[in-house]
């Protein structure tokens, strides 16, 4: 693949991004590789000078390694002798030029995206499971857990960002197309829009699951309004929109969808008993719990409007994943599958056995109750998880292991305090990706907001020991919730992904040690 300098100039001019250009010989010059990492350069590379931590020495390194053109928001002396494209916004430029370099792979895929404070990953996996059932496993995935760009085991790998940098995203999409994939299901984070990682991308289907305050802090969103604004961009950039009618800020979400989408292509869903007298648009799909237990989740989906009844998806569904909150995620995914052409039988078969590493993985022990590993990592997901456990186990003693990440998501900390005070009997506050912050200070900040008359607190920064002590302290009828990291096999500490066995592995080791059993978490 290659892209000419002239094509780059035309694209940047078309989007009013080009401020100036320095052409060394001819605009017919071609670039055969693209990169924003000075360590990843080939001969004739188009290099993007991006990021808050960018240093001119990176451009010098890229030049010496073979880059022949750079894109930046200002000219650099270090780029003397190179072609230069000076732009108003390098992140937008990188998205547009990467799409062109990789020959617009989105045009060869049916692209579906989920946004929401919680439920993105689960919904994405549910939909992938159903689409795979219909298309023979040709569904690509971009998620916070794994990325899948082909049918072979080596085509699946651990993701580093919920939504990759635009260059990586379009490269992965091209790989998926070349590997025969026909559909792409992806999570789109608020940061993806704030940092223009998906700039210029239009989705066939866009889902808005829910919203509550999260990712608000110095290095993320300055306030909730900014967070909401970024989330809403998915609605503006989708051909068809699926919205949870129960979401907070529904009016803003629906209004954003209608700016670019005809109401006939906007679908609403909600629980059967949900009522909102202020809602002046019909709810197309309803769902209702059939049975909840610690083995399966069963619910029924109703097509309530004429528009909804055109999709043959009405009926009963079973999920292997536990939690009544997953019924909403499942409903969203089923609607998406219906819009992609699937019927009830295909959906029911495809969704039934979907599991996600680190999401609602459970182990019933003999002497230490029910142990649950889940990725719940904000107030909304913690509240939903503990509420479900309280109801399902008839008000058990709830023991929670949790920590908050450093350098971001500062708003999560009071949310953890509030949720633990509301539902937990005992909390072990521990380390969870502290970054450059002191994990003890983070734990103490959470502890300061907890009502200690309701929740007993232990600060144990060694996460493995915290998990051990939590399980060891539990009785046969108790519930132990290990929250936040799921299947992550690392801790982000001072800029380094430090190896960590994962909560699932640690919890199983503890259970085996305490009870002498050699079993594995329910998948």
Curated annotation (Swiss-Prot):
Q: Which residues are ATP-binding?
A: 116-122
In what way is this protein post-translationally modified? Carboxylation is probably crucial for Mg(2+) binding and, consequently, for the gamma-phosphate positioning of ATP.
Pathway it works in: Cell wall biogenesis; peptidoglycan biosynthesis
Going by the UniProt record, its keywords in alphabetical order are: ATP-binding, Cell cycle, Cell division, Cell shape, Cell wall biogenesis/degradation, Cytoplasm, Ligase, Nucleotide-binding, Peptidoglycan synthesis
Recorded E.C. number(s)?
6.3.2.-
- Identify the InterPro entries for this entry: Mur-like_cat_sf, Mur_ligase_C, Mur_ligase_C_dom_sf, Mur_ligase_cen, MurE/MurF_N, UDP-N-AcMur-Glu-dNH2Pim_ligase
Q: Where in the cell is it found?
A: Cytoplasm
Residues modified as N6-carboxylysine: 231
At the top of the EC hierarchy, this enzyme's class is ligase
> What GO biological process terms does the UniProt entry carry, in alphabetical order?
cell division; cell wall organization; peptidoglycan biosynthetic process; regulation of cell shape
Q: Which residues bind UDP-N-acetyl-alpha-D-muramoyl-L-alanyl-D-glutamate?
A: 38, 162-163, 189, 197
- A GO molecular-function descriptor: magnesium ion binding
The UniProt entry's GO CC annotations, sorted and at most eight, read: cytoplasm
The record's principal subcellular location, in a coarse class, is: cytoplasm
Q: Name one Pfam family in it.
A: Mur_ligase_M
The UniProt function text for this chain reads: Catalyzes the addition of an amino acid to the nucleotide precursor UDP-N-acetylmuramoyl-L-alanyl-D-glutamate (UMAG) in the biosynthesis of bacterial cell-wall peptidoglycan.
HAMAP family from the UniProt entry = MurE
Which family does this protein fall into? Belongs to the MurCDEF family. MurE subfamily.
Question: What's the protein here called?
Answer: UDP-N-acetylmuramyl-tripeptide synthetase
* Organism name: Lactobacillus acidophilus (strain ATCC 700396 / NCK56 / N2 / NCFM)
The root-end lineage is:
Bacteria, Bacillati, Bacillota, Bacilli, Lactobacillales
